[in-house]
Amino acid sequence: MNPLIMTTILTTVILGTLIVMMSSHWLLIWIGFEMNMLAIIPMLMKQHNPRSTEAATKYFFTQATASMLLMLAVLLNLMYSGQWTVMKLYNPTASMIMTMALTMKLGLAPFHFWVPEVTQGIPLSSGLILLTWQKLAPLTVLYTISPNINLTMLLTMSIASIAIGGWGGLNQTQLRKIMAYSSIAHMGWMTTILIYNPTMTLLNLVIYILMTTTMFMLFMTSSSTTTLSLSHMWNKTPMIVTITLATLLSLGGLPPLTGFMPKWMIIQELTKNNNIILPTIMAITALLNLFFYMRLTYATSLTMFPTTNNMKIKWQFENPKRLSLLTPMIVLSTLTLPPTPMIIILN
């Protein structure tokens, strides 16, 4: 893609998200969502093939439907209260429709079906943007309207997302689909705690973006898109095999890695609110995610694909400069659990 066009598209994507995040007027929020959606579609179609076109079309239809529901909720609320302000969402029907629209944009169950299909059909770089940056705008609006959200509806969607994110990834061999199901599960954890402690949702989001970005960068460095290609990683870049192992386990939420921090804090916060059954279900379903990450870990570092002797020295010709950006990301996504008690005290 032409660098000038790519720069324009990226600027529009960023601008659309920032408009949503900084607006207190529903019409501006809707405009920001539309700008963001229309700008990211060419990024999804960077590779000119039928699969990427199909993925972009699915993304467009889903996001357009969500935008229609969002505008319907805004108009219902306007008829009820006469207000365009985001904080003035008092109509229960409008609140319910708004929650459906935003969860559809996020990819929460039962509106999650588009996430694995779209992620699988696009390049790794576009998948990274889709699963990280594109979550910021809907989560910001959910954060803003959290006092007026139907608690039962959101918790049901969240628990379903955690369970589906775990079950869906079990049989997958495509790394992009696995990351998509992981995203669904992480969104479930974030929206569960949104009602009780919105600040913790933001902390969870930052950690999720760090871990997901690190994982996608590792996949792009080793050109891996399937579990089979992960077994070739030790030939190409043996130095990052151990790093990949730690990052995968961190993404699965295994202590003492960074990924355990949000789960620990969320379970503790729910328990403080005398909610015992909910964190128990969440902790059990989180084991499903950990299981398929353990499978990836096994494929990455504990198996060796049959190769010739010439293949075994291929890593010597790789350019180590590409790994320079990965270093701080790896440290942050695996080794930031120790400050957790201090964060809990400050919170």
Curated annotation (Swiss-Prot):
> Is the keyword Cell inner membrane in the record?
no
Record keyword Membrane present: yes
Recorded GO MF terms: NADH dehydrogenase (ubiquinone) activity
- CC annotations in GO: mitochondrial inner membrane
The UniProt record lists the EC number as: 7.1.1.2
- State the UniProt keywords alphabetically: Electron transport, Membrane, Mitochondrion, Mitochondrion inner membrane, NAD, Respiratory chain, Translocase, Transmembrane, Transmembrane helix, Transport, Ubiquinone
The primary site where this protein sits is mitochondrion
List the membrane topology term(s).
Multi-pass membrane protein
Transmembrane intervals: 13-33, 59-79, 96-116, 122-142, 149-169, 178-198, 200-220, 240-260, 276-296, 325-345
Q: How does it assemble?
A: Core subunit of respiratory chain NADH dehydrogenase (Complex I) which is composed of 45 different subunits. Interacts with TMEM242.
Q: Describe the task this protein carries out.
A: Core subunit of the mitochondrial membrane respiratory chain NADH dehydrogenase (Complex I) which catalyzes electron transfer from NADH through the respiratory chain, using ubiquinone as an electron acceptor. Essential for the catalytic activity and assembly of complex I.
Sequence similarity: Belongs to the complex I subunit 2 family.
State the protein's name. Answer: NADH-ubiquinone oxidoreductase chain 2
Query: Which organism was this protein described from?
Result: Molossus ater (Black mastiff bat)
Lineage, highest ranks first: Eukaryota, Metazoa, Chordata, Craniata, Vertebrata
- The gene it comes from is MT-ND2
